[in-house]
Amino acid sequence: MRYALIASMLGQAAISVAMPSEPAHSPRAAGAQAYASNQAGNYKLTSIAAPVQGNGSPGPSTWNLSIDDTSSGYKQKIVGFGAAVTDATVSAFNELSASTLSQLLDELMTGAGASFSLMRHTIGASDLSGDPAYTYDDNGGNADPGMTGFNLGDRGTAMATMLAQMKGLNSNLQIFGSPWSAPGWMKLNNAIDGNTNNNNLNDGYLTNNGAQYSAAFAQYFVKYIQAFESHGATINAITLQNEPLNSQAGYPTMYMFSYEQGDLIQNYVAPALKAAGLSTKIWAYDHNTDQPDFPEQVMGIAADDVSAVAWHCYATNLDWTVLTNFHNSYPNTDQYMTECWTPSTGAWNQAASFTMGPLQNWARGVAAWTLGTTAQDGPHLSSGGCGTCTGLVTINNGQYTFQTAYYMMAQFSKFMPVGATVLSGTGSYTYSGSGGVQSVASLNPDGTRTVVIENTFGNDIYIHLSTSSGQEWSGNVPTNSVTTWVLPAV
């Protein structure tokens, strides 16, 4: 849960940077290329000296990396990178003129900028919604198991419309939705907001009074998916509950047990989607890496109906190798990093690290929290809203600014296209408190290879890269930067 961990996650201040410097030429052009974004802000997807074959001219600090770009090194295929489209995002973006919004979306969704192809969105209100909190079937607090009062409302319609615009710019875009709470009338506490007692779905799991609203909960997803599709926003996947182990008060939350989630998926939500002719996939969990038993227990019940597991970054002792352990147990189940915040006071490389770590450990995609906010980190709920959640993009006085986190994520998304295959590699290491080098590589559909290198040392590092295909590449990686090499096809 992001708020309890603010103090432990803050670091050096992020820099606010303006429009991106476009690479001088296409990342798919002949020959090796290199692009960098850094803490200082003078590199923003900037073309720098490309690596050369052989040893080159090593500097005083060198580091060896290796990748297996043969079939024996193939790992997961990339689905994409992006962020959460929240009510705050939609509201902030819609402050822009039509022409400025068009330019912004083009930079987010196409090769003109980040080429984002994975977007999460909030089903109803989240902590990054303006007052009041809402769902798509509040019905005045009255029970509505037949969903006769279902309505996206102005905010849901605006969100669906914006997601459809994004899909129109990038046909590869995958959209997944997550609710922060079921409608209050479906819950034991009869409220959208969380609390310490009865902040649970009224599905009989705690009360032994029958399924109650389990079927209605499933139909809520069906209605929402159909409504968004009617606006041109296809929903590719859902999670049943954002942060199911979070029952925090002050904003929409809902506690959900692992066995409860497994039962809901197997006996209600999956059958309802199938009966409605929907191909939307179900992702389990959607919470931190410190409770891996939760998704494992869900898989024990509903493995046939779960296509992926979703993870967040807020564990006190964050360890992305949990994803590798899960992969070893469930090699046919996809994994995604679906939420990590990007506060303006966070470490410069925070977004790079929460993208790098999951990719090294079998994640097929990464989504930050959140895509866009105002310069005041909102709009957000007045009670319990996140007042320090800065978007990858901030909107102020009719203009937009890309934050450091945007560039860090774009170092991956722009150069690791949909369908790229992540490669196994060696040489990544971070010293406790004194920097290090982390890397991840991919074999792209056109045969080129991408190597993303994160240097957290206070000096440049000369990288020597060996490939299993028999090549040697060398080049400089600037201090406190994320640098991407694009190597030609073998």
Curated annotation (Swiss-Prot):
Top EC category: hydrolase
Biological process, per Gene Ontology: glucosylceramide catabolic process; polysaccharide metabolic process
Activity relative to temperature: Optimum temperature is 50 degrees Celsius. After 30 minutes incubation at 50 degrees Celsius in the absence of substrate 50% of activity is lost.
Localisation: Secreted, Extracellular space
pH-dependent activity: Optimum pH is 5.0. At least 20% of maximum activity is retained between pH 4.0 and 7.0.
Catalyzed reaction equations: Random hydrolysis of (1->6)-linkages in (1->6)-beta-D-glucans
Record keywords, A-Z: Glycosidase, Hydrolase, Secreted, Signal
Signal peptide: 1-28
Major localization listed first in the record, in broad terms: secreted
GO molecular function, one term: glucosylceramidase activity
Keyword Secreted: yes
InterPro entries: GH30_C (IPR033452), Glyco_hydro_30 (IPR001139), Glyco_hydro_30_TIM-barrel (IPR033453), Glyco_hydro_b (IPR013780), Glycoside_hydrolase_SF (IPR017853)
E.C. number: 3.2.1.75
Induction context: By fungal cell walls.
One cellular-component annotation, GO: membrane
Stretches of the chain forming a coiled coil according to its record: none
Disulfide bonds: none
Family note: Belongs to the glycosyl hydrolase 30 family.
Known function: Has highest activity on the linear beta-1,6-glucan pustulan. Lower activity against yeast glucan and laminarin (beta-1,3-glucans with beta-1,6-branches). No activity on colloidal chitin, pachyman, starch, cellulose, nigeran, dextran or gentobiose.
Protein name in the entry: Endo-1,6-beta-D-glucanase BGN16.3
Species: Trichoderma harzianum (Hypocrea lixii)
